[in-house]
Amino acid sequence: MPKMKTKSGAKKRFKPTASGFKHKHAFKSHILTKMTTKRKRQLRGTSLMHPSDVAKVERMLRVR
């Protein structure tokens, strides 16, 4: 039987680390004038995925 392919969209969006999966924040691409500076600053950078979503992403990436 052939190997299972990973979901290419998930492969581009999530990066596995020792403590979970890193991901970028949403809502930070365009039409940012109405957003406050504080909100834009909070959306900067990456964060770890919520534990309830980890199982779904592991299944998409065929990890563990």
Swiss-Prot record:
Protein name: Large ribosomal subunit protein bL35
Entry similarity comment: Belongs to the bacterial ribosomal protein bL35 family.
GO cellular component: cytosolic large ribosomal subunit
Alphabetical list of NCBIfam families matching this protein: rpmI_bact
Entry-linked InterPro entries: Ribosomal_bL35, Ribosomal_bL35-like, Ribosomal_bL35_CS, Ribosomal_bL35_sf
Keywords noted in UniProt: Ribonucleoprotein, Ribosomal protein
PROSITE patterns per the UniProt record, alphabetical: RIBOSOMAL_L35
Gene giving rise to this polypeptide: rpmI
Keyword Ligase: no
GO terms, molecular function: structural constituent of ribosome
Biological process per Gene Ontology, one example term: translation
Disordered: annotated span: 1-27
